[in-house]
Amino acid sequence: MTWRAVAEKDFRDAIRSRWLFGATAFFVLFVGGATALFFGMLLPPDARDASNLFGFFANLGVFSLSFPGLLALILGFIGLSTSYGAIIDERESGSLKLMLSLPNSRRDVVVGKLLGRSAVVAVALLAGFLAAFVGFLATGTSVDYGAFVPHVALTVILGVAFVSIGLGISAAADSNREATLATLGLYLIFGILWSSIAEGIPKLINYVAEQAPFVSPLENLTRVKIGLFLKYVNPLKTYETLAAQVYYGAGQARLVSAAFGEQVALGPVFQEGMPFYFTGWFLMLVLLAWVVAPVALGYYVFEKRDL
């Protein structure tokens, strides 16, 4: 038995438990249903373009709303739910020791679990986008495949990233309760608290600088850049920005969901040239890092642990 066998078993287990069917049905109803409702009922025929939904962004100054952002928030929850118990549940039930005696290495287990759970999320997602495509055909909606296909690929990568995060937690946790609390806490941070933390860190640096002699506070532009960069460490924000880029271009994508102060400070900067740490390829590296780093750290802890 190898990592491939572990992945296949995990995928079959998802089918038997109906988790795959449940996730698939949800994404078909959500993505396909939103497409049918938006283009079949809400928009007139001459405004039926896929970007009007999948590239929808509304910035209200204080907060922003987007379809990619909503999809990412839901996908993050499903990706974490799919994977946070993958290893710790089998460890607590005793089946993990049996799996490791077949023989499998711990690396086989982690890699197999990652691939198996990622396949579950990817299949469910692709079914949802396929339903959207059927909706495009049924409603006569025009599609720019040069934007839509990369958007689908980015969404799958985000799903795998959250599977990796959940699996890393599962591999490192001491109990199912610990894994559950860590997963819920991290989801809360990603979904609600991250922006406030990112904006607060430069302010904290300035506060410390004001109290310390011979240390100058950050300039306003530098403070805004640091805050926005820290926001992009969040995979939800990174995905949302990359999704905006496939529809609007790099400069506008960085500002479409930015706060008013960020728009004022960074608009002229982005017109002159994009700093490398805000470029699309750099943000793509950040997103891919979320695919690799969490599961690698979880495996490191798991490998050292006495079962």
Model-flagged regions — what are they?
Residues L80-L102, L114:
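Transmembrane helix boundary and interhelical loop/hinge segments in multi-pass membrane proteins
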Residues A34-A36, G40, L53-G69, G116-D174, ...:
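Secretory targeting signals
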Residues M41-L43, I192-V292, A296:
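Terminal transmembrane helical anchor/hairpin motif
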Residues G79-S83, A131, I165, W194, ...:
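Hydrophobic/aromatic residues in alpha-helical transmembrane segments
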Residues V62-D89:
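Long, hydrophobic alpha-helical segments
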Residues S105-R117:
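Membrane-interface alpha-helices at helix entry/exit sites of multi-pass transporters
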Residues I15-G22, F67, A153-A212:
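A structural motif at transmembrane helix-loop-helix junctions in multipass membrane proteins
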